[in-house]
């Protein structure tokens, strides 16, 4: 019994203590393993591969493989071209930060391959100018339903704007058209003043369809030039113009005889193939930049005005007289024309004479139709094209607006914050918003007599008048606001 109590009893606590230690260590080890697995597979794990761009049937043809050999080939190409690949250890040059674009990136075949467009030439034909033109491509023609909606909205907006400005003395379409057709340098002397009696901008919209992209030979671009062909059709529309004038006989004396003439021309139907392509500007223009005034010739206040104007984007635009860009770089132009197989059906009605009138003379209709056809072919029918410069689509604060119906206070706060961040923390004061435009009026000029707030029933709570209120100017003891200082907090009621 004594031996059992001496050896057996103390042995039980020893076994329980050993099992607790083992369990504690096992639990700690499992927690460490879980944390390590989480860090390895969830935090430092590789991102999954992005989904394929094309359809499931085109996945195999669109698959791109990147291998070590391909990288070696690219490195060899760069070495042969004279430009070695830049490594992280090399210090970049301050004069050549932008990496050169390889010539193959702007090639026509490279663009078609990277955009998965099959424009392989299947039939070549010689044009009158000796160029090769691809008749069609292997890519399926595309419908332009979305493009028709956008064009219809644009034309409808133009029609509405022209009708709203019909009584404007300077922006009326009637005055502009009258000034164009009565140009003394183009109008013959035997035609009296032309008076526009009726204008109809139509009610229907052109329908574009069957769009396809082809590659044409162009000596000015590497690998040819891409061109989009689309069919356009406009029919059953009420697009017409009616005028009145007089034919003057100036022999043997001026205005010896006058013959009144009334004409009405309507477009019955127009159909054709529109060609659109992007071409660079032909000749770069020299830059015209506004010189920066010398700080020694200006006082402190004028210098602050100039710096504040440059920071806030209100400085004179150096590209106002240079449409090609800030530094003379040519812009990209949009060239469009119609193929010679177009169809233009016109309806010409005429009324000649004052007492005994001749109505709808066939010879007059033929002369008018021939003149309109010649005018159209001299401008937009191949090989002649119309070149239009594309606008600048870079986001700018001056073109930023707020959609109608949004929160006015949120729009004012967003506009004030954006202008403040752009001006580098300069003093910016935002006025209340008018109910019509819902745009913040920003003023940061430190030398104006005072800021004016335009009140409105929707912008100012409890204030129904829309008069201007003058804010008293700061006292002479007030320190001068310097751009770059902390902005003042303006609370709008």
Swiss-Prot record:
TM stretches of this protein: 24-44
Segments of skewed composition (Polar residues): 93-104
Gene Ontology BP, a term: mitochondrial genome maintenance
Coarse class of the protein's main subcellular location: endoplasmic reticulum
Subcellular location: Endoplasmic reticulum membrane
Residues in the Lumenal compartment per record: 1-23
A GO CC term attached to the entry: ERMES complex
Name of one Pfam family that matches: MMM1
Region spans: Disordered: 52-104, 420-493
Domain SMP-LTD: 140-391
InterPro entries for the chain: Mmm1, MMM1_dom, SMP_LBD
Domain notes: The SMP-LTD domain is a barrel-like domain that can bind various types of glycerophospholipids in its interior and mediate their transfer between two adjacent bilayers.
Family: Belongs to the MMM1 family.
Job description of the protein: Component of the ERMES/MDM complex, which serves as a molecular tether to connect the endoplasmic reticulum (ER) and mitochondria. Components of this complex are involved in the control of mitochondrial shape and protein biogenesis, and function in nonvesicular lipid trafficking between the ER and mitochondria. The mdm12-mmm1 subcomplex functions in the major beta-barrel assembly pathway that is responsible for biogenesis of all outer membrane beta-barrel proteins, and acts in a late step after the SAM complex.
HAMAP family named among the record's database cross-references: Mmm1
Subunit structure: Homodimer. Component of the ER-mitochondria encounter structure (ERMES) or MDM complex, composed of mmm1, mdm10, mdm12 and mdm34. A mmm1 homodimer associates with one molecule of mdm12 on each side in a pairwise head-to-tail manner, and the SMP-LTD domains of mmm1 and mdm12 generate a continuous hydrophobic tunnel for phospholipid trafficking.
The protein's name: Maintenance of mitochondrial morphology protein 1
């Amino acid at each position: 019994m004594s031996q059992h109590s001496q050896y057996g009893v103390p042995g039980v606590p020893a076994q329980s203590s050993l099992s607790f230690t083992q369990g504690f260590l096992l639990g700690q080890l499992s927690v460490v393993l879980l944390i390590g697995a989480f860090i390895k597979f969830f935090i430092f794990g590789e991102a999954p591969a992005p989904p394929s761009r094309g359809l499931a049937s085109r996945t195999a043809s669109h698959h791109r493989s990147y291998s070590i050999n391909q990288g070696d080939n690219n490195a060899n190409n760069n070495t042969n071209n004279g430009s070695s690949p830049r490594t992280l250890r090399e210090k970049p040059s301050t004069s050549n930060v932008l990496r050169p674009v390889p010539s193959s990136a702007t090639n026509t075949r490279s663009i078609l391959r990277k955009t998965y467009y099959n424009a392989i030439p299947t039939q070549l034909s010689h044009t009158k100018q000796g160029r090769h033109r691809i008749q069609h491509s292997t890519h399926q023609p595309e419908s332009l339903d979305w493009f028709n909606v956008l064009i219809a909205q644009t034309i409808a907006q133009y029609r509405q704007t022209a009708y709203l400005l019909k009584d404007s003395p300077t922006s009326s379409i009637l005055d502009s058209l009258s000034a164009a057709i009565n140009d003394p340098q183009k109008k013959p002397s035997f035609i009296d003043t032309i008076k526009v009696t009726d204008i109809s901008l139509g009610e229907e919209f052109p329908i574009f369809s069957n769009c396809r992209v082809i590659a044409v030979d162009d000596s000015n671009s590497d690998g040819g030039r891409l061109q989009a062909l689309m069919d356009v059709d406009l029919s059953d529309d009420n697009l017409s113009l009616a005028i009145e004038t007089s034919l003057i006989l100036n022999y043997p004396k001026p205005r010896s005889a006058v013959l009144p003439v009334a004409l009405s021309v309507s477009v019955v139907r127009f159909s054709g193939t529109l060609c659109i392509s992007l071409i660079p500007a032909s000749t770069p223009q020299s830059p015209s930049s506004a010189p920066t005034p010398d700080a020694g010739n200006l006082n402190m206040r004028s210098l602050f005005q100039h710096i504040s104007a440059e920071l806030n984007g209100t400085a004179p635009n150096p590209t106002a007289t240079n449409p090609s860009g800030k530094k003379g770089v040519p812009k990209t132009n949009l060239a469009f024309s119609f193929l010679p197989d177009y169809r233009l059906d016109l309806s010409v009605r005429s009324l000649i004479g004052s007492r005994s009138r001749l109505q709808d003379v066939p010879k007059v209709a033929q002369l008018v139709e021939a003149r309109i056809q010649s005018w159209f072919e001299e401008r937009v029918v191949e090989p002649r094209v119309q070149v239009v410069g594309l606008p600048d689509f870079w986001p700018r604060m001056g073109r930023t607006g707020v959609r109608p119906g949004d929160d006015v206070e949120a729009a004012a706060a967003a506009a004030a914050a954006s202008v403040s961040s752009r001006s580098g923390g300069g003093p910016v004061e935002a006025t209340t918003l008018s109910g019509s435009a819902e745009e913040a009026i920003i003023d940061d000029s430190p030398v104006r007599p005072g800021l004016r707030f335009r009140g409105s029933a929707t912008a100012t709570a409890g204030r129904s008048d829309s008069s201007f209120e003058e804010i008293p100017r700061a006292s002479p003891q007030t320190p001068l606001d310097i751009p770059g200082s902390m902005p003042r907090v303006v609370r709008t009621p």
